[in-house]
A protein has these predicted regions:
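Short histidine/acidic/glycine/proline-rich micro-motifs that form metal-
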Residues: 11-12, 116-122, 150-153
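N-terminal beta1-alpha1 ligand-phosphate binding loop
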Residues: 1-29
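Helix-loop-strand module that forms the ligand-binding subsite of alpha/beta enzymes
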Residues: 40-138
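Short, well-ordered alpha-helices that flank and scaffold nucleotide-derived cofactor binding pockets
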Residues: 19, 23-27, 133, 137, ...
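Glycine-rich phosphate/pyrophosphate-binding loop and the adjoining helix
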Residues: 136-205
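A short beta-strand-loop structural module common to alpha/beta enzyme folds
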Residues: 28-44
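Residues at the starts of beta-strands that form the adenosine-phosphate
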Residues: 1-2, 34, 109, 141
């Protein structure tokens, strides 16, 4: 079996989470050879290959997935003096939003995750909800509810979140190894109100 983790990361938090999920998947599938972790910029159709599970994640910006203007904001934030934030190696590449648009139709099982500030999702938003919605529209089958991993107000990963991401990866592996059809889930909760982001800070990860 093959699991592919695709991520977008600005300050490295989502990258760390993606790697931890990949590690958990590898432990659950009993082989790291069964797991590939890729930044969005490297995740073409050929790289997805014959994946049995697709895991997609990105930072929450202005209640949803990043846009060019929010990635530009993150870049400017990292350049500020006396700032310990460092842009991820692939931060300048395309975001998950654009990647999903170009992905096309598929039937692969999937799970989605995001990084965001703590707080009610209706106020903070969750990129993972929108990622899941896009993938379902493309025909992919959701096997786990969207998951959030939290960052501090200084845009660093909260303590314990890396380990939690690894455990989530193990749970995804368990789902993949069992009868996936019985684990298919639907996310029928009301979607949060769309927000233009004015007066709010994005949650880059």
């Amino acid at each position: 079996m093959l699991a592919v983790v695709v991520y977008e990361s600005m300050f490295g938090n989502t990258h760390v989470v993606a790697d931890a999920i990949g590690k958990g998947l590898g432990e659950g599938l009993e082989s790291v050879d069964n797991v590939v972790v890729l930044p969005v910029v490297e995740a073409g159709r050929a790289q997805l290959g014959d994946a049995d599970l697709l895991v997609v994640g990105g930072p929450t910006h202005f209640h949803g997935m990043s846009r060019p203007r929010t990635r530009k904001w993150a870049n400017a934030t990292a350049q500020k003096p006396k700032n310990d934030l460092v842009l991820d190696h692939d931060a300048q590449g395309p975001g998950v939003r654009d990647w999903l648009t170009s992905l096309g139709h598929g039937h692969t099982k999937f799970a989605a995750f995001d990084t965001r500030f703590k707080g009610p999702a209706v106020l903070r938003g969750r990129a993972s909800r929108l990622i899941s919605r896009k993938l379902r529209r493309h025909g992919f089958e959701m096997v786990a509810k969207p998951e959030s991993f939290f960052v501090t107000l200084q845009n660093h990963l909260e303590p314990g979140e890396e380990a939690r991401a690894q455990e989530w990866g193990k749970r995804l592996a368990s789902i993949l190894l069992s009868d996936g059809v019985t684990h298919a889930v639907r996310d029928n909760r009301p979607h949060p109100r769309r927000c233009d982001g004015r007066g709010d800070d994005p949650d880059p990860g």
